[in-house]
A protein has these predicted regions:
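Loop-to-transmembrane-helix transition segments
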Residues: 14, 24-27, 33-56, 128-140, ...
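Juxtamembrane boundary at the C-terminal end of a transmembrane helix
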Residues: 219, 277-283
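Helix-capping/transition residues at the boundaries of transmembrane alpha-helices
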Residues: 3-5, 61, 88, 153-154, ...
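Flexible interhelical linker loops that connect adjacent transmembrane helices
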Residues: 113-133, 183-194, 253-256
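Specific alpha-helical transmembrane segments that line the substrate/conduction pathway
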Residues: 46-50, 61-107, 162-171, 221-243
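Juxtamembrane helix-loop-helix junctions in multi-pass membrane proteins
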Residues: 1-18, 33, 144-169, 220-228
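Loop-to-transmembrane alpha-helix entry segments
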Residues: 37, 73, 86-118, 246-278
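Cytoplasmic-side transmembrane-helix entry/capping segments in multi-pass membrane proteins
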Residues: 5-17, 64-76, 96-100, 125-136, ...
């Protein structure tokens, strides 16, 4: 996203469109599936819910500091412990529940910045920061739409589902762009596109994330476990990337803070590793 000055919705709409060729190739490899009875209603609910989550995420990052909004995404695996059994997304074992909670708290601690007014500061800010409240809703929506992904997967296959869903999300993004533009929330300059290269990269990495997400769901067959595993990626995002970038002279200390806070974040990393070991060995 840092490679383009285009509005987030513009980036998302073009990003979804650039995923289409990858999805078509993936569908060609796996073949067109037999569509089950629950496929279309899963898509029907997924698109508007994920669109709402997208809007809330954009507004949250506009209204509140990232440090107060990021921790809420860690709550999705915990919410899935309730939503997944109700929606057919899998029943974790008791130790599996413990592992998911370990991962949840670990991801949360990774995103809590040293020097805040306590580790519960993001929750305390709910009444003060609308962005915090928005991201809490995003985490709740995530606990629903991930189960819808699993339902759609069981009633078709991964590439067919994400191709249909991705094209509909691109259409919704375009509609949202027009609405935002008419209300003056998008400047004309934010439509400026000097190069399609950033959008191609965004589409490629979006495809990669979706591909591994759907493939993991196909084999794990347990939504809380899969999302808990997915959230462990923040170890690389918040710790690994910070250390690597902080060590490169090219960035001239721009990521020095991430390196300095490594010790503070090791506790979160330890919880995540412990949680995943519990899930793998006893889940």
């Amino acid at each position: 996203m840092k490679l383009s000055k285009a509005h987030t919705l513009v980036l998302l709409s073009l990003g979804y469109l650039f995923t289409v060729p990858f999805y078509v190739v993936w569908l060609w490899v796996e073949g067109i599936p037999k569509i089950g009875p629950n496929f279309w209603w899963a898509v029907f609910f997924h698109v508007p819910l994920w669109s709402i989550a997208m809007i809330l995420t954009i507004e949250a990052h506009r209204r509140s500091p990232f440090i107060l909004t990021a921790p809420y995404l860690a709550l999705t695996p915990a919410f899935l412990l309730v939503s997944s059994p109700l929606m057919g997304g899998g029943y974790p074992t008791r130790l599996g529940v413990l592992g998911v909670l370990f991962v949840t708290f670990g991801v949360y601690f990774l995103n809590v910045k040293e020097g805040q007014n306590g580790i519960l500061d993001p929750f305390i800010q709910i009444g003060k920061e609308k962005g915090s409240l928005f991201m809490l809703f995003v985490a709740l929506i995530g606990a629903v739409v991930t189960n819808l992904d699993f339902i759609a997967l069981k009633n078709a296959n991964g590439p067919f589902y994400v191709l249909i869903d991705g094209m509909l999300m691109a259409l919704v993004s375009v509609i949202l762009i027009l609405i935002y533009w008419q209300r003056g929330k998008i400047e004309t300059s934010e439509f400026s596109i000097k190069s399609f290269w950033p959008f191609f990269l965004f589409g490629f990495f979006l495809f990669g994330a979706v591909f591994f997400h759907m493939t993991a769901l196909k084999f794990i067959q347990n939504v809380p476990y899969e999302i808990a595993g997915k959230r462990t990626g923040v170890i690389l995002a918040t710790v690994g990337s910070g250390l690597i970038l902080a060590s490169l002279k090219r960035f001239q200390g721009k990521f020095k803070e991430e390196k300095e806070q490594l010790g503070y974040r090791l506790f979160g990393v330890g919880l995540i590793v412990a949680g995943m070991l519990i899930i793998i060995l006893r889940g």
